[in-house]
Structure formats: C-alpha cells, structure tokens
C-alpha cells in the first residue's frame, strides 16, 4: 500500500484514498522536474519479522522508515491504518547501541521517542523497534521488541539520491523536498558552489606558484612564495584557502637584503649607486682620495646577497715623498727627469774639474824638466 507525504501543490479538502494515491504518483513523478521532491511512505499488507521487513523495504522502496521529527510522527499517526501488530521501523540495537540502520548513525537523546518505561529489553532479546499507531496509550511512540516477531513493514521512498548534493553534502529528507547540509568549503541549494578566497599576487622581488584543485583561488587552493636572490621572505612561505573563505596566512613580502651603510673616507669622497634601495643588494660605491693623499684599499665595493660588502672601506693617507718611493713604484712623474738632469750636471762638472787638474799637472811637470 502507498500513501502520500503531502506535497506543496496538493489541494485542501477531503479526498478518497484512491484520489490521494493517484495524487501522490502525479506529485512525485512530475514535480522533480521543477525542483520539488515528494517523500512517500509505504507499508506491507502482511506481517513479517524485522529482517524480512527490511529486505522488503530495500527491495521495493528505499529502506525501513527513519523518523526524523515529531511532525513526521504526527503525520504517520494520522495517516496509517491501525494494525494490531503495529509497524517495524529502521532502528536496531547494534553492539548495545540503538542505531538508525539506513545511515548507520547512533540514535541521539534528542531524537528518542520511547513509550512509557521503554526500552525495557524484556528477556534481553528486544533489539528491534516498532512504532505504535492508533494505540490507546503512547500512540506514536516507540517500543523495543524481539526481532523475530511478525509486524508490518513501514517503508519510505526517498527523494535524496547520491548526486542530490553533488556529492559535497548530506541530503536530508524534508517535507515536500530535501535539504542539503553542505560539506565545509561548499554552498548552494545543492552544494554546487565552491567557497572562494581573495585572489593573491606574487610579491615584488619574488614569485608565486599555486595549485587550484576546485577552481582559481577557491577552497583547497594552495599557494607557495619564493623570493629572488638578494631578498628575504617576511611571512609564511605557504598559504591555503580555507572553508571559511579566508587564507590560512596573509600574503608575505620579499624585502631586499641590506648592507651596513658606508661613509666617505677622511680626505676623500664616495659615490654610490642604489638600484634597489640605499645600501642594499647590488648597491656599488666608488672611493676617491684628494691631492697629496694615497688610497689604501680597494677603490670599489659592492653589496652582496649575503648582506656584506665585497671589500672593506678604504682610507686616504697623506703622501710621503722619498727616493725609496721609486723602488716601490710610488713617485711623482717629474722626479725622474729632474734626477737625470742633476746627475748629468754633476758628472759634467766632475769631468771639467778632472780635465783642469790634469792640465795643471802637465804644466808643472814641464817647468821641472826645463831649468832654464
């Protein structure tokens, strides 16, 4: 037998059971094309034990009924015919725990609907659950009973399908429809949309590499950052788009490596170029000494990626003129011709003096040889 869960389009008024049955078929067959699903209940004409009742429901419909709220209980109580043996429902004790067999979820305290003094587990064999319908006392309530007893099977046909929530959420049957409880990171009536995060950009002086398994800069997207030579990363090197639409970490920045600032030497000057920032990676400084001073050290130094200069700052030292400088190669260019001239004049004077001495000596010898 089949009887309907009321559809939103059903008209008010008294209907015969046949009309209700026809209305149910039309509602559940046509409305899904317009986004509405009906949830119908079914029950067996004959009684059977709990195991066979579940087989009957799964073979012909979806499963034994899973009661979700009081409104459903009220509707079942109002609509189902009285059956002296009552109806099996989809709850069973598994490992001493009452469990919804359709979802394999534990029955919570909030969802319990036991009759007075139930469950009592008489003879320690009452592991299945029936629902009282049109009973004088505790009607609509549950009772634990032995699974071998024979009762009518109370089944349902669900509108939820594996693809109902795009496999990104839990489909929950509701009156005239179903509702999707989306998994983290998804949203929408059928969980068809993915949570988005703000797009990221590569930092200056660096690069960014991202993977987007579900869409650009969306849930589960991951981005990794790297800095170029001569700069260092400030912040986290990796970040991920979370289910809330926020990144796990803020975008990092790449800061250029700094070297110690330099100053011009005493008695000299310094000229520097700074392509990236003052006294930072690739900065270059050139030193010059004033007149009468000598440069001690390298004339040029460059800031390296390690944060150190290629050579220490030079100094300017006053020049000391001496002949020893000639040997060292440090002398004034005018010194050589002057020295040559002095040497030449000195040699010439010596030759003239020597010639005069020889001439005087010759004359003296002649006088001694001639007495008269």
Swiss-Prot record:
GO terms for biological process: calcium-dependent cell-cell adhesion via plasma membrane cell adhesion molecules; cellular response to interleukin-8; heterophilic cell-cell adhesion via plasma membrane cell adhesion molecules; heterotypic cell-cell adhesion; leukocyte tethering or rolling; negative regulation of leukocyte tethering or rolling; positive regulation of leukocyte adhesion to arterial endothelial cell; positive regulation of neutrophil chemotaxis. GO terms for molecular function: calcium ion binding; cell adhesion molecule binding; glycolipid binding; oligosaccharide binding; protease binding; sialic acid binding. Residues 55-155 form the C-type lectin domain. N-glycosylated. Residues 29-38 form a propeptide. It comes from the Eukaryota. Calcium-dependent lectin that mediates cell adhesion by binding to glycoproteins on neighboring cells. Mediates the adherence of lymphocytes to endothelial cells of high endothelial venules in peripheral lymph nodes. Promotes initial tethering and rolling of leukocytes in endothelia. This is L-selectin.
């Amino acid at each position: 037998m089949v009887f309907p869960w009321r559809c939103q389009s059903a008209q008010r008024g008294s209907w015969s059971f046949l009309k209700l049955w026809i209305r149910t078929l039309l509602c559940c067959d046509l409305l899904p094309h317009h986004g509405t699903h009906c949830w119908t209940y079914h029950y067996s004409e004959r009684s059977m034990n709990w195991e066979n009742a579940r087989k009957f429901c799964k073979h012909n419909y979806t499963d034994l009924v899973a009661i979700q709220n009081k409104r459903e209980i009220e509707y079942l109580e109002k609509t189902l015919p009285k059956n002296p043996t009552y109806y099996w429902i989809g709850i069973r004790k598994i490992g001493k725990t009452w469990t919804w067999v359709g979802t394999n979820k534990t029955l919570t305290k909030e969802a319990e609907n036991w009759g007075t003094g139930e469950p009592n587990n008489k003879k320690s064999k009452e592991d299945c659950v029936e629902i009282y319908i049109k009973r004088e006392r505790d009607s609509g309530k549950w009772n634990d009973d032995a699974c071998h007893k024979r009762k009518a099977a109370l089944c349902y046909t669900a509108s939820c399908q594996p693809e109902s929530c795009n496999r990104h959420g839990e489909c929950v049957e509701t009156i005239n429809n179903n509702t999707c409880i989306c998994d983290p990171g998804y949203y929408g009536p059928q969980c068809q949309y993915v949570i988005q995060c703000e797009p990221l950009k590569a930092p200056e002086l660096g690069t960014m590499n991202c993977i987007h398994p579900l869409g650009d800069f969306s849930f589960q997207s991951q981005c990794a950052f790297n800095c170029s030579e001569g700069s260092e990363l400030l912040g986290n090197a990796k970040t991920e788009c979370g289910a809330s639409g926020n990144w796990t970490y803020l975008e990092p920045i790449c800061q250029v490596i700094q070297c110690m600032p330099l100053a011009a030497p005493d008695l000299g000057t310094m000229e520097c170029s700074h392509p990236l920032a003052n006294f930072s990676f690739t900065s270059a400084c050139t030193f010059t000494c004033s007149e009468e001073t000598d440069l001690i050290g390298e004339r040029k130094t460059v800031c390296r990626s390690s944060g150190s200069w290629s050579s220490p700052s030079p100094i300017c030292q006053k020049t000391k003129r001496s002949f020893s400088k000639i040997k060292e190669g440090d002398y004034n260019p005018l010194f050589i011709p002057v020295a040559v001239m002095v040497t030449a004049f000195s040699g010439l004077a010596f030759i003239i003096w020597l010639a005069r001495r020889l001439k005087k000596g010759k004359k003296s010898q002649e006088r001694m040889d001639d007495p008269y």
